[in-house]
Amino acid sequence: MGVEISLDPPVCPIQANGGVSKHKMINHTDRHMAYKVKSSNNSNYSVNLIYGILKVCDVKELVITRKPGKPQADKLIIQYCMVVDENTDPKPLFANGVPPGELSGETVIKLSAAE
């Protein structure tokens, strides 16, 4: 397993007093990939995409928003798995964590809020 899904840029430099960071979420595979985006700190961070399908070699814009708050070591986790049908509802797939499969896993993005 390599890097099936990545973010560009791979880091999120948002100030502790709040802000927005835009990233490209990229599917590097020749398969449709379902994803779920999780945050270690839902009080301070939100994203525009939580569940979805990245089609073959697709790119979507992920917008990360931070509310003002104390800086700490937070992270975003993009869980993913391969799906055959691009019209699959991704939400039930992640009800028990990352589904097992040939192409499944997680991509971790460090969120570094600077003061």
From Swiss-Prot:
It comes from the Eukaryota. Residues 1-115 form the MSP domain. It holds the Pfam family Motile_Sperm. This is Uncharacterized protein ZK1307.4. Gene3D superfamilies: Immunoglobulins. InterPro entries: Ig-like_fold (IPR013783), MSP_dom (IPR000535), PapD-like_sf (IPR008962), Sperm-specific_class_P (IPR051774).
